[in-house]
């Protein structure tokens, strides 16, 4: 009942669920490979090094979830600043749309974490097990001391790199110097243990085993990228008009003879397939598995040099460029097309709005929380008192003094210190008792009445600007 019907003559059966086959990608060198490794170094120096930098005595980049404070150098954000995170995510999304419309999956091929860590893991693999053919022979060889030593060493280094990656990731959310001190005694908290192991093992599994499966099946970007492509998108392309018909070296002669007239420049060496990290044949045309890494371009250019043919049989080009034989200048002129211009305009507007909002935002935030222990109570002389807790969040790099006042009802009075000091990039909870005289309370009767807290940042010798922020709440009168 589960047996598929026989295929018609001349047709091909495509299985929806294909068994994973190990891809042993061949090493390659060239212009694009050098750029890819440059970006590997750049991204990893930033990722591993950023948490260790200090800014005014604190960790420069720290997403302190426990304190609900995010530090990005001199920029301190609180949960009330969630709009900025939303804006940043929108900027990243439109940036990805723009890059994809112009140059295809170039992000995937050069800077995606999956690609970056797979490259690092494959480098370790090549150092210990050899290049493609050596690894294939090692896979087929029976288990012995040499094989166990090579495989064990590889996995040990993979795990070390993966756990260090997990440790660094947690260091963005817990002070990394504290985390480093705890590492020597293995005195991590339960959540720290969980995330170091989870992120580390996820890196180990994704970069060591799943590899191209993540790009082909797990990553949603591979599926919806075609919605952002058009015929003027720069992609890795095979020039079939120049390359076909393919032929082996034997038909071309090896003693300076000219190649047969019926053969194209492609010598059918399959090196472009062997170096591809996703195992595809770029000569079949645009495929969703292609991540745009250009490994096939580098290896093909090397073959063309040896054959004394012009480079560019496989190259970055557009579908229109191949079909219409466009020059490089003509191809780049088509970059400024409506899709790209719209993405660019929206991206610039969002970046401008985000930058302006950050520039003009107040240097502090206020949050009002009612004391849940006692909603309202009677105190001396029949006055009615409500108790609140105000969180004063200083997002500047200098200590600030604040003055708190309350309004909204006649006779309302805030019982709080005249000035409240908050350190640089810190927050402080301040208890505030708000009292209403008995006469006004009797005239109003029971119920909830709107009031407003006004928090004023006092001028300092370095900054005479007076900032003011207001927050609304309610004052409860009991029956």
What are these regions (language model features)?
Residues 1-246, 297, 310-347:
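Membrane-embedded alpha-helical bundles of multi-pass integral membrane proteins
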Residues 100-115, 207-222, 257-304:
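Cysteine-centered iron-sulfur cluster-binding motifs in ferredoxin-type domains/subunits
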Residues 352-376:
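Hydrophobic alpha-helical transmembrane segments in integral membrane proteins
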Residues 381-385, 424-427:
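Solvent-exposed, conformationally flexible loop/turn segments
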Residues 392-396:
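Asparagine-centered strand-capping/turn motif at beta-strand->loop junctions
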Residues 397-411:
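Short acidic, flexible loop segments centered on an aromatic residue
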Residues 414-441:
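Intrinsically disordered, low-complexity Pro/Gly/Ser/Thr-rich segments with frequent PxxP/GP/PP motifs
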Residues 437-479:
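Terminal connector regions
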């Amino acid at each position: 009942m589960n047996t598929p019907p026989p295929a018609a003559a001349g047709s091909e059966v495509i299985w929806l669920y294909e068994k994973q086959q190990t891809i042993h990608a061949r090493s390659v060198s060239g212009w694009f490979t050098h750029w890819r490794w440059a970006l590997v170094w750049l991204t990893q120096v930033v990722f591993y090094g950023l948490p260790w930098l200090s800014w005014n005595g604190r960790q420069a980049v720290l997403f302190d979830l426990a304190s609900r404070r995010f530090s990005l150098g001199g920029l301190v954000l609180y949960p009330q600043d969630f709009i900025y995170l939303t804006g940043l995510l929108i900027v990243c999304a439109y940036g990805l749309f723009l890059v994809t419309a112009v140059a295809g999956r170039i992000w995937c091929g050069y800077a995606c974490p999956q690609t970056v860590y797979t490259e690092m893991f494959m480098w370790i693999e090549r150092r210990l097990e050899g290049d493609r053919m050596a690894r294939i022979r090692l896979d087929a060889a029976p288990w012995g001391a040499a094989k166990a030593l090579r495989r064990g060493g590889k996995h040990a280094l993979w795990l070390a790199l993966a756990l260090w990656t997990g440790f660094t990731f947690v260091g963005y959310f817990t002070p990394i110097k504290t985390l480093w001190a705890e590492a020597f005694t293995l005195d991590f908290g339960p959540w720290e243990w969980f995330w170091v192991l989870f992120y580390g093992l996820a890196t180990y599994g994704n970069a060591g085993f799943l590899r191209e499966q993540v790009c082909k099946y797990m990553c949603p970007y591979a599926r919806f990228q075609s919605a952002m492509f058009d015929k003027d998108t720069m992609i890795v392309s095979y020039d079939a008009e120049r390359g076909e018909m393919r032929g082996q070296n034997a038909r071309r002669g090896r003693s300076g003879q000219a190649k047969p007239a019926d053969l194209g420049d492609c010598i059918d060496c399959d090196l472009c397939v062997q170096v591809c990290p996703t195992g595809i044949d770029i000569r079949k045309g645009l495929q969703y598995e292609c991540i745009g890494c250009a490994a096939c371009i580098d290896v093909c250019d090397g073959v063309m040099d040896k054959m004394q043919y012009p480079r560019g049989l496989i190259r970055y080009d557009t579908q229109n460029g191949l079909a219409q034989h466009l020059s490089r200048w003509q191809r780049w002129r088509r970059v400024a097309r409506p899709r790209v211009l719209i993405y660019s305009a929206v991206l610039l507007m969002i970046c401008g709005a985000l930058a302006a909002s950050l520039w003009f935002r107040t240097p502090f935030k206020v949050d009002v929380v009612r004391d849940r222990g006692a909603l309202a109570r009677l105190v001396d002389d029949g006055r009615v008192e409500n108790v609140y807790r105000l969180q004063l969040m200083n997002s500047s790099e200098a200590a600030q003094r604040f003055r708190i006042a309350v309004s909204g009802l006649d006779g309302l009075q805030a019982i709080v210190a005249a000035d409240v000091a908050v350190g640089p990039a810190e927050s402080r909870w301040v208890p505030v008792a708000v009292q209403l005289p008995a006469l006004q309370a009797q005239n109003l009767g029971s119920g909830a009445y709107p009031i407003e807290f006004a928090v004023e940042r006092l001028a300092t010798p370095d900054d005479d600007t007076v900032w003011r922020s207001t927050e609304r709440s309610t004052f409860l009168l009991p029956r």
